[in-house]
Amino acid sequence: MTTAVAHPPTRKMLPRQLRWLTVLVTGSALYAAVFAALLGTQDILFVPSLLLVGAAVVPVTFITFLGGMSRRGDLSFAQVAAAAALGGVIGTVVAGSLEFETIRELGSLPTLTIGLIEESAKLAIPAIILTWRKPRPLDGLVLGVAVGSGFAALETMGYAFVALVGSGGHLESVTHLLLVRSVAEPGGHAAWTGLACAALFAIRGSRRRWFGWLRFFCVFAGVIALHATWDSLASEHGYLLVGGASFTLLMAVTWYLHRDTGARPPLPPNRAAHPRDHKRQPDCHRHPAQRQRDSVPWLSHAFGTPTGSSPPNAPSPPSSTAASIRRH
């Protein structure tokens, strides 16, 4: 009589490439819950939660989306989250201070200057990481997107607060601003910093270092130009146009880097998968000393194949009969 063994049910995990959907749905539900509570109670204590969740849903979703595309990345979730938090805070503080000093000295703030200051400030944390690690360009792109998303989230919170105060507490202007910036955010700071960081992290891997630096400065100049164009248009249609172009460039670079990282030459058909497989022979054909050494890995590495045993693919010596035939 046989008894059936009950196996525990296997949990079906959502593919890594689709986890961003969970983040988006969860974040949207949280925003709707906070918004409903604010409307129902008219309690201003819900306003900070509304601004925080509304400004962070799309940036966190976009970071998760790009992180899911990088299967062989060396970055953990904690590292990416820390880069987003530190890069966002330090970037906004440094950029805001420099822009304030520039306005005080020059009396105005050109859009090109804004782009140069903010894009340089956002590269502070990735540049520090690059000094003590050697990540790949794809990891640099993910880090750049994380830093840019953190910067954009904090900036959106500031703009939403200004809109709330300027409108006398009306939520329509706040929700409209959050919606527009959320739609355009993946093609804004996240895309610009991601492109710049990918070019920065690719310098070490360049065969000619000068070419890597030249490529970085060209990409950085293009990023500043996109940023300046974004600020000069100052309209919803302009944001969507520049954001769409920036997002397309980011996706093209991501696809290229992911393809370049994932491409590996296949193994030869006759090559063993394990580096020591060529030493593993049936016990009847192996020297007794080799059997003992194979049972202790460090002995096999230290002494190699003992005398008297031959590799499995080595040709067998000719017999005496064949040798005598060849001599005649």
Language model regions located:
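Hydrophobic alpha-helical segments at protein termini of multi-pass membrane proteins
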Residues: M1-S316, S320-H328
